Amino acid sequence: MLIVLPPSETKTHGGSGKPLDFHHLSFPSLTKARQTILADLQALEVDEALKVLGISEKLRPEAESNRALETSPTMPAIFRYSGVLYDALDAATLPEKALERLAIGSALFGVIHATDPIPHYRLSGGTKLPTKSGELPTMKARWGTSISEALIDVNQLVIDLRSGTYQQLGRVKDAVTVRVESVMEDGSRKVVSHFNKHYKGELARVLALSEKEAHNAEDVMSIAQAAGLVVEENPNHKETLTLVV
């Protein structure tokens, strides 16, 4: 199984790895698109980047880091991204076998494996990044069907924990997806938004550490339930599971 996580806007700076080498990234079919997007992102002057990326002057260092994408140090992607989901995942305590089951969606790289070395960058899935010819394509248009095709080619069950924006960049037919819901006092259900990432991080950790391999949604549910999580099937869509918290 391959567990695909969403990226995070917050990232760890620095790193001790050599500068970015596209040949050291997984899913080589995405290389050409990666190179084009990176070149367009790196070409943005900082003031223009603030507007394009939709960030404030306070985050100017984020835009400045994009000017050095090919020269700045790298670190494994799983440690580059930070935030609520990654805190719950606690990748630093995962064995190598568990890390091999993890991938991450990315506006810049499409999808990468957890251990792929990447630099610090700022680019979200909803950004319209200008091309050298002045066009403003969406990230979805830039990636086309390439992310979907790359994930289909892994020939494993894909457990897609990406947020909607990143799923739009490359959906995977028959992938298992997960909704997070809480039970209200009156028994009704409410979709969890604020802590959604935390619970998905916990689920990703459980799945990554599992001694069993998942081949379908029922297997995913079984693994999660064995670890004490409350997971339910969706009678109307067998690939969609509900994590109840």
Curated annotation (Swiss-Prot):
GO terms for cellular component: cytosol. It holds the Pfam family H2O2_YaaD. One of its GO terms (biological process) is response to hydroperoxide. InterPro entries: YaaA (IPR005583). This is UPF0246 protein Cgl1995/cg2186. Belongs to the UPF0246 family. It comes from Corynebacterium glutamicum (strain ATCC 13032 / DSM 20300 / JCM 1318 / BCRC 11384 / CCUG 27702 / LMG 3730 / NBRC 12168 / NCIMB 10025 / NRRL B-2784 / 534).
